[in-house]
Regions:
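Metal-dependent nuclease catalytic cores that hydrolyze phosphodiester bonds in DNA/RNA
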Residues: 1-109
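Conserved small/polar residues in nucleotide/adenosyl-binding loops
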Residues: 203-210
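Short, structured interface segments
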Residues: 188-202
Length: 213
């Protein structure tokens, strides 16, 4: 049996990046843990906040970037996909970049640096947030791994951008000054090792749940 035949015979699981990390980390929603639920109004406000922050970025920032990967793990073929809130590509030196017309076909050159931006609106005083929420960080790391793999990057950064949804009606200047950022840079090797552990854990748990039923 060749590799393609073996892959075809495996059970295909289609899963979003968000559902993947939530299945493994099993953390409650941050608003639920602080007495607020993800109501339709909150989801609508969260969508507004995403667009507002994204529009404040320059030409080096590309919003709502679809990413997907398919891989074999154990008895399964995982088809993992999601949408990065934003990808920002900056360049060393004075060279100006504008990817507005060719982002999807971009070749990332050696003097460019890529940052995956994950935007989260929460009902919480940002001063009380000392570190990014685990599932949010894991989402960004998944996107970073997929993008780095597909663009042959040695390193890539992730940024978690948090906004308190209670401040959404502030003026643009005050609003953009009321954001909190957490930023990390990873080597591709670090992300590859982490992502492998994530997918192995997922398939093991899925197999265990299947046997139970």
């Amino acid at each position: 049996m060749d590799a393609q035949q073996e892959k075809d015979e495996k059970k295909i699981i289609k899963i979003s990046v968000r559902n993947l990390v939530e299945f493994i980390l099993r953390e409650g929603d941050i608003d639920n843990r602080h007495g607020r639920t993800a109501s339709p109004e909150a989801m609508w406000e969260g969508s507004r906040i995403h667009k507002r922050i994204q529009k404040s970025k320059g030409a080096n920032y590309h919003a709502e970037v679809p990413l997907k990967i398919e891989l074999s793990e154990g008895d399964y073929t995982l088809a993992i996909e999601g949408r990065a809130d934003g990808i920002e590509i900056t360049c060393d030196g004075e060279r100006q970049l504008d990817f507005s017309n060719n982002f999807n076909h971009l070749t990332v050159e050696e003097d460019m640096h890529v940052t995956i931006d994950e935007i989260k609106g929460i009902y919480m005083n940002l001063d009380a947030l000392d570190e990014p929420v685990g599932v949010h960080r894991a989402q960004a790391m998944c996107y970073a791994y997929i993008y780095a793999l597909q663009h042959d990057l040695a390193e890539i950064s992730v940024q978690l951008t948090y906004c308190n949804l209670d401040t959404i009606e502030l003026t643009k200047t005050a609003f953009l000054g009321n954001l909190k950022y957490f930023r990390e840079t990873f080597s591709f090797a670090e992300l590859a090792e982490w992502f492998t552990r994530l997918t192995v854990s997922y398939t093991h748990l899925r197999a265990h749940e299947t046997r139970r039923h």
